[in-house]
UniProtKB/Swiss-Prot annotation:
Catalytic residues, chain numbering: 104 (for dna cleavage activity)
Cofactor note text: Divalent metal cations, possibly Mg(2+) or Mn(2+).
Species, as recorded: Tomato pseudo-curly top virus (TPCTV)
Name by which UniProt lists this protein: Replication-associated protein
Segments forming domain CRESS-DNA virus Rep endonuclease: 9-117
């Protein structure tokens, strides 16, 4: 008697699906896959649409589950056309390395995703597999505290002897983006902005990112207190605010900002630190942190330098000193100087 055909069954946390000759859009496919009822929660789905050389479309899909999903129905992942009675049946595989599948699915770039990709230790090269699994589990946690707890329980040796480095690394990995500044006044409140100052802002903020010049000039604004210069500078867009000293900690400094506001930082201090990097909008430079590893700064953005006249605060007076002649020539080439003689607003800001 012929033997019974082998029953279909795949048990895996990560599934790799390929739908040949599938006319569905990636959005339609993602919507149907999200609505599939499964005993274990779905964590991540990525759908990629690809065209064969003959022009026929097909879809690649990576699905990650919270735990192993035991699939016994080879039609479970079938998709349905919304316009006609057509079913699209996939080739179904358990993905041994979800990271490798993720890279493969990404190769043509026409993708859509839902959820958060779960790091797969099987893709890590070298080291013991068990340690890779524990590290992957820690990285997939939602907070530094949860990740540390996993390491403490499952990698106690690393927790005990590498605690300082662990905390430092996890601080960087789980650091939330700096909270965006919300200006208390609308930009239209500043009705007395000097023409040169407004022109500088319009030429940078009034155009698309692609149209902005490389290494746009910075601007140094000198004026008395309560002239509104800080509020004006902070109302132009997403920025880094460096007040009194320079702090490039990822909790307060973002490489995604459009510009820097340097407020009440003395010119002598800035000269010792990163004058040319910040005022010159230089790209890809490092800053040494007092209690940590050097921070990589993406750069390439201008700075608005704010200062008061006289004393040790005036950048103009500082650059007029004989020993700063070369720095003055460089700064005049890389920055616009504005001296305020009246408030930037009518009323109180």
């Amino acid at each position: 008697m012929p033997s019974n055909p082998k029953r279909f069954q795949i048990a895996a946390k990560n599934y790799f699906l390929t739908y040949p000759n599938c006319s569905l859009s990636k959005e339609e496919a993602l919507d149907q896959l999200q609505r599939l009822q499964t005993p274990t929660n779905k964590k991540y789905i990525k759908v990629a649409r690809e065209l064969h050389e003959n022009g026929e479309p097909h879809l690649h899909v990576l699905i990650q589950f919270e735990g192993k999903f035991n699939c016994k129905n080879q039609r479970f992942f079938d998709l349905v056309s919304p316009t006609r009675s057509t079913h699209f049946h996939p080739n179904i595989q358990g993905a041994k390395s979800s990271s490798d599948v993720n890279s493969y699915v990404d190769k043509d770039g026409d993708t859509i995703e839902w959820g958060e990709f779960q790091i797969d230790a099987r893709s890590a090269r070298g080291g013991q597999q068990t340690a890779n699994d524990e590290c992957a589990e820690a990285l997939n946690r939602s907070s530094k505290e949860e990740a540390l707890q996993i390491i403490k329980e499952k990698l106690p040796k690393d927790f005990l002897f590498c605690y300082h480095n662990l905390v430092s690394n996890l601080d960087r990995i789980f650091t939330p983006a700096p909270t965006p500044f919300v200006p208390p006044f609308q930009l239209s409140s500043f009705t007395n902005v000097p023409e040169d100052m407004q022109e500088w802002a319009d030429d940078y903020f009034g155009v698309s990112a692609a149209a902005r010049p490389m290494r746009y000039k910075s601007i140094i604004i000198e004026g008395e207190s309560r002239t509104g210069k800080t509020m004006w500078a902070r109302s132009l867009g997403p920025h880094n605010y460096l007040s009194g000293h320079l702090d490039f900690n990822s909790r307060v400094y973002s490489n995604s900002a459009l510009y820097n506001v340097i407020d009440d930082v003395t010119p002598h201090y800035l000269k010792l630190k990163h004058w040319k990097e910040l005022i010159g909008a230089q790209r890809d430079w490092q800053s040494n942190c007092k209690y940590g590893k050097p921070v990589q700064i993406k750069g390439g953005i201008p700075s608005i330098v704010l200062c008061n006249p006289g004393g040790d605060t005036s950048f103009q007076d500082f650059l007029d000193k004989e020993e700063n002649e070369a720095l003055k020539d460089w700064t005049l080439y890389n920055a616009v100087f504005i001296k305020l003689t009246e408030p930037l607003y009518d009323g109180t800001v």
